[in-house]
Amino acid sequence: MPELPEVETVRKGLEQKLKNFIIKRVEICRESTVAYPIDKQDFVKGLQNSLINKWDRRGKYLIAKLKKADRNHTYIENEMSLKNNGSLVVHLRMTGYFTFNKNPTSPCKHTRIRLFDNNNNELRYIDVRSFGQMWWVREGLSPKNIIKGLGALGPEPFSEKFNISYLTKIILNKTRSIKSILLDQTIVAGIGNIYADESLYSAGISPFREARTIEKHELIKLRIAIIEVLKKSIGAGGTTFSDFRDLEGENGNFGLQTNVYRRTGKKCHACKNLIERQKISGRSTHWCRKCQK
């Protein structure tokens, strides 16, 4: 599943590519991709003649802020003059990704949603496993109230709220493994399997440790490691091990730089001990027994 760095990479690509993109036509190729509104035609009508004003990210969710354009508008010089038109929210789930096509072709087998502007440029959403979802939340409603997972998210790893005081309270008396804590989106938003493994390795902490046993100096190292690993991956365009692509169809390159993830049986870069793999809460976990305590 695309994690914070992959979703941030997509967000940046969308923001750079979709300048003055006014949605003129919406084509739903798979109705189950539209999670809200229930009536799919409300989704279509809500997006039509909407200017995609800004792309935000919250955890693994993409959020496009929309402005209402006149049906005759083809270019907007002053976006501030337009009324807000709610938000388009996207969760890529396991295999979702976008492509931007100036010369659209017929939709491929796994095309789920197609958005066209006045020049027939196409923003295409493709999803092999079809777990990804989209919501159009009209102005006046809060996406956090409509989308349960979005409203339950913990703080962003880069935010001021994600500090040592917060982490200390979170792990207090917790017998869960520290890795399961990091994977809990209600505790910290956006970290998944890849970056939990990599961050714990960088901090020298065993993923199997009970959270309550992590001392303050270790928490400090872990917080720094999380931020550094995420920033490094964003700089590399994220990680691709299966279906993730950026808007240009390129793979992320962070997978070439991992220390433990998907390196089972290979030598640790630091101590030459072999990287091991074992499941925690049903998730494959990669670690170095010697470097992580």
Swiss-Prot record:
InterPro entries xrefs: DNA_glyclase/AP_lyase_DNA-bd, DNA_glyclase_Znf_dom_DNA_BS, Formamido-pyr_DNA_Glyclase, FPG_cat, MutM-like_N-ter, Ribosomal_uS13-like_H2TH, Znf_DNA_glyclase/AP_lyase, Znf_FPG/IleRS
Organism: Prochlorococcus marinus (strain MIT 9515)
Active site residues according to the UniProt entry: 2-3, 60, 283
Gene expressing this chain: mutM
Molecular-function GO terms, alphabetical: 8-oxo-7,8-dihydroguanine DNA N-glycosylase activity; class I DNA-(apurinic or apyrimidinic site) endonuclease activity; damaged DNA binding; zinc ion binding
Cofactor note: Binds 1 zinc ion per subunit.
UniProt-annotated binding residues for DNA: 110, 129, 174
Identification of the protein by name: Formamidopyrimidine-DNA glycosylase
Catalysed reactions listed for this entry: Hydrolysis of DNA containing ring-opened 7-methylguanine residues, releasing 2,6-diamino-4-hydroxy-5-(N-methyl)formamidopyrimidine; 2'-deoxyribonucleotide-(2'-deoxyribose 5'-phosphate)-2'-deoxyribonucleotide-DNA = a 3'-end 2'-deoxyribonucleotide-(2,3-dehydro-2,3-deoxyribose 5'-phosphate)-DNA + a 5'-end 5'-phospho-2'-deoxyribonucleoside-DNA + H(+)
Record text on subunit structure and interactions: Monomer.
Zn-finger (FPG-type) residues: 259-293
EC number(s) reported in the record: 3.2.2.23, 4.2.99.18
Taxonomic lineage: Bacteria, Bacillati, Cyanobacteriota, Cyanophyceae, Synechococcales
Family membership: Belongs to the FPG family.
